[in-house]
Amino acid sequence: PKTLEQAEIEKVDLAIAMTQYDEVNMVACQMIKHISKKTKTMARIRATQYLGGKGSEIFEAGDYTIDVVISPENLITDFIKRIIEVPGANKVLDFGNGQASMVSVKAKGGLITGHKISELKEIIPNVDVRVAAINRDENLIIPNGSDTINKGDEVFFISAKKDIKKVISTIYQYDKGYKNIMIAGGGRIGRRLANSLESKYRVKIIEADKERCVYLNEKLENSLILHGDSSDSELLEEENIDNMDLFCALTNNDEANVMSVSYTHLTLPTNGEV
C-alpha cells in the first residue's frame, strides 16, 4: 500500500497488473481499489480455475473487483478458433455481441476478383457487406464502389457473422473447410484449443513431454495424444501429415514451430498452417 500511495495511485485512471503471478495481480488490484475506488483495474490472469465457473466470482465480490480480466492464452485460442471456423480468413474480429464480424481475406479465385466492389450486390444480392479497406502491395486503400479487387489483395470486409462464408466465397475460392487438425504442442494454448475443437473436428496433438501427454489424455475426451517432437519430419509423415487440413504450431519453442511449419508448408503447400 505504501508503494501505491507513493506512486499517487489515486491520481491514476487505469492500473494494469501484468506480473507472471495471478495471485499477485489479484492482490495488487485489491489494494488499488482499497486506496482509490475510481481507478480502473486490469489484470492478467492465466489459471483456468479463475476464469470460469465459481472461480470467476472472485472478480465480482467486494474489494476484489477487477474491472478487466485479460487471459493471453484465451485470447490466442479464440483468435485461432475464429480463423479455423472461417476457412480462407486471415483475421476475424467479432463485435456487436458476436452478431457482426470484420474479416480479412486474400483475394484468390473468387467471383469478385478482378471486378468492381459495386458488383458484390449482384453476386450476393441478399447480403449486406461493406468493404472497409484493401491492402495492396503494402499500401492501404479506403475503397469505394468503383474500385476493383485484384488477385493478391488483402480485403477487409464487414458483414453479419452468418454471412461471412458467403462473402469469402466471392473473394477466395477454397475447396472445403477444415476437418482434420494437428496441433504441435500441448501446453496451455494447445490444450485449450484442442478442448474447444474436439467436438467438431478430428484433433491430434503432438507433445514432447511424456507427463504432459498423460495429463492431456486425462483432460481431453476426443483428441488423439501423441508423444514426440513436432519438428521431426519422420514423425509427421508417420502420423499422416498429408491427411491434415490444418497444422497449428503452438509449442513454447519458436524455432521448433518455424521448423515444423516450414516442413508442412513445403510438403503440403495447399494446407493451412497457424
Please describe what each predicted stretch is:
Residues P1-V274:
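Cytosolic regulatory regions of ion transport systems
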